[in-house]
């Protein structure tokens, strides 16, 4: 029983244990099943993912294969093109070598010709220099001879001028004295003529008085006592009927006291008595004066003309003032005629007492010899005084003329001294210009020789194939991307040049090369440069097309790589690196361009005045040396060739 009980208990324990194990197994199986289900789901998801990845990889591989096939085709095409280009380049190389050999031969022949011509020009220059020195010596000698002869002629001219001035002053003095004597003689003649007219009028008056007295019956038979007691008022003369001689002597005695004031009155107004006696003359001179009037008028006109000439020729104002105070004979004749008409009118009214008074006053015109002598002495003293005044005036005029002549001589000497100084200055400036011209020509010769030697050395260097190819590519790059760099390189070259050289070069460029006989082969080089400039745009277009093709290939590669994420990440990194490098290069190129533009602006901003000054110097040089253009033309050609060779060497150094 005990065993039965134990067995039952053990059986239950065993059953419970078994049940527990079954339950735990079931639970473990369920959990395992769930875990397996989750792993299965994960595996299915991974399988789907890998399936998708496999599909994408297959698609990418297909695209890669297609792109590879296209790349192989393009590579084959590029190989073919490269072969063709290589063949073309070989042909071009051969042709270029042939043309280079021809150019070398031409340049050598031209250099030999230019060397021969240079030697000829040197010999001509030496000959011209000798001729110039001889001409300068001759010019100096001729200048000395000219200055010597000029000084001799000048001294002789001044001496002759002084002699002629002295002779002229003497002649003027003699002419003036002769005219003064003529004027005085004419005055004396006029005085004598007026005295003669007065005497004639007195004779006519006496005749008239005689006739009137004869007509009066009371005076025909007068008593002797009455005849003795008859007196005439104002000293008038009795008629000739009574004791003619005694009465005439009495008349003369009565006339003499009134004669003292006569000469002074004759000096101041010689015709004053004629004015008073005009009444007595009016009746008689109606018959007598009329035939004399034409002669008197002629004499008066001649006298008036002579006086006008004398007045025009007289120098100084003192003589004019003195003559203005004295009445001229024309004025006296005019006054006499006016008063003659007035007195004739008075005579028509009748004035017997005036007739007697005028007759007595007319008698005062008779002068004694003593009074005439005194009058002549006074006239001589007056003439001496006038002659003294004339001499003093002539001496003053002579001194004034000598002073003016000395001033003129001083002015002429100063003018001649200024002219000589200007001539010396001009000769000095010409000598300096000639010396500068000689130095400049020597510098030109030296520069031309150096350029020619450098050109020969540069042409003698053999060029390699790769170097020629690199130079062509570099020339294309410069033609496409950097056109301003060449301009910048050329502009400093022009700026460093001498302005005189630029002026000569511009003067040479003004000459038409086609008209120049010395132009040997210049047109060939110009045509070659034009062909090269025309080929540069074509080469730049071809390079642009090749760059466009490369851009298209890069875009295709970018599209192909877009499908693969790993490759895409690698491509993104490479793209970032490439973009960074491109940005750095673009920044560098932009900075270079800015610096170039800034330099160009500075050159254009700094040197417009220099260019204008060069243009002005060029105009002055062209005006000053129009004949020197042909002489320097060949030298300028050599300089241009040397500049081209220097530019080529500079490009090689840059490459």
From Swiss-Prot:
Phosphorylated by c-AMP-dependent kinases most probably in its lumenal part. O-glycosylated; modified by sialic acid residues. Its main location: Golgi. Residues 399-423, 433-442 have a biased composition (Low complexity). The modification Phosphothreonine is found at residue 589. Residues 122-145, 256-275, 285-655 are annotated as: Disordered. Residues 66-216 form a coiled coil. This is Golgi integral membrane protein 4. It comes from Mus musculus (Mouse). GO terms for cellular component: endosome membrane; Golgi apparatus; Golgi cisterna membrane; Golgi membrane; membrane. Glycans are attached at residue 229.
């Amino acid at each position: 029983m005990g065993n039965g009980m134990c067995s039952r208990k053990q059986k239950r324990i065993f059953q419970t244990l078994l049940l527990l194990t079954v339950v735990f197994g079931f639970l473990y199986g369920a959990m395992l099943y769930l875990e397996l289900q989750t792993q299965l789901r994960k595996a299915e998801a991974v399988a789907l993912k890998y399936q998708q990845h496999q599909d994408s990889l297959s698609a990418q591989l297909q695209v890669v294969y297609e792109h590879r096939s296209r790349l192989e085709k393009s590579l084959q095409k590029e190989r073919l093109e490269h072969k063709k280009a290589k063949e073309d380049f070989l042909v071009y190389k051969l042709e270029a070598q042939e043309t280079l050999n021809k150019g070398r031969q031409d340049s050598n022949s031209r250099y030999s010709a230019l060397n021969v011509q240079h030697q000829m020009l040197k010999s001509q220059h030496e000959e011209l220099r000798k001729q110039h020195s001889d001409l300068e010596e001759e010019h100096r000698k001729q200048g000395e001879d000219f200055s010597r002869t000029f000084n001799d002629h000048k001294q002789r001219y001044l001496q002759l001028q002084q002699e002629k001035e002295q002779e002229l002053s003497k002649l003027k003095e003699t002419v003036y004295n002769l005219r003064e004597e003529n004027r005085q003689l004419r005055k004396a003649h006029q005085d004598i003529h007026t005295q003669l007219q007065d005497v004639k009028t007195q004779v006519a008056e006496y005749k008239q008085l005689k006739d009137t007295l004869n007509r009066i019956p009371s005076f025909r038979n007068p008593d002797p006592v009455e005849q003795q007691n008859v007196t005439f008022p104002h000293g008038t003369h009795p008629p000739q009927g009574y004791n003619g001689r005694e009465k005439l002597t009495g008349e003369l005695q009565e006339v003499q006291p009134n004669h003292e004031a006569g000469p002074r009155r004759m000096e101041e107004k010689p015709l004053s008595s004629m004015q008073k006696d005009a009444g007595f003359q009016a009746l008689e001179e109606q018959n007598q004066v009329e035939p004399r009037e034409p002669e008197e008028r002629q004499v008066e006109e001649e006298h008036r003309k002579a006086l006008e000439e004398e007045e025009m020729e007289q120098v100084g104002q003192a003589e004019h003032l003195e003559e203005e105070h004295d009445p001229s004979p024309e004025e006296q004749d005019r006054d006499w005629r006016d008063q003659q008409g007035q007195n004739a009118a008075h005579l028509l009214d009748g004035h017997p007492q005036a007739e007697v008074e005028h007759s007595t006053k007319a008698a005062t015109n008779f002068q004694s010899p003593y009074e005439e002598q005194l009058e002549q002495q006074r006239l001589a003293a007056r003439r001496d005084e006038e002659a003294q005044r004339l001499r003093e005036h002539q001496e003053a005029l002579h001194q004034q003329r000598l002073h003016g002549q000395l001033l003129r001589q001083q002015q002429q000497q100063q003018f001649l001294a200024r002219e000589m100084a200007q001539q010396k200055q001009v000769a000095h400036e010409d000598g300096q210009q000639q010396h500068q011209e000689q130095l400049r020509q020597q510098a030109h010769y030296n520069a031309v020789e150096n350029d020619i030697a450098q050109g020969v050395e540069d042409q003698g260097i053999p060029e390699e194939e790769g170097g020629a190819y690199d130079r062509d590519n570099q020339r294309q790059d410069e033609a496409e991307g950097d056109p301003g760099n060449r301009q910048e390189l050329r502009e400093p070259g022009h700026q460093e040049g001498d302005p005189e050289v630029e002026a000569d070069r511009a003067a040479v460029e003004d000459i038409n090369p086609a008209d120049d006989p010395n132009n040997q082969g210049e047109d060939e080089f110009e045509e070659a440069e034009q062909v090269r400039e025309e080929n540069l745009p074509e080469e730049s277009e071809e390079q642009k097309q090749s760059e466009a093709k490369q851009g298209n290939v890069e875009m295709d590669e970018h599209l192909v790589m877009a499908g693969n994420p790993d490759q895409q990440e690698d491509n993104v990194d490479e793209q970032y690196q490439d973009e960074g490098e491109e940005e750095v290069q673009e920044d560098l190129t932009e900075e270079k361009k800015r610096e170039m533009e800034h330099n160009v602006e500075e050159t254009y901003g700094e040197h417009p005045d220099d260019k204008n000054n060069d243009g002005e110097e060029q105009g002055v040089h062209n005006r000053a040396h129009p004949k020197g253009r042909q002489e320097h033309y060949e030298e300028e050609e050599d300089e241009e060739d040397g500049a081209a060779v220097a530019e080529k060497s500079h490009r090689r150094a840059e490459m």
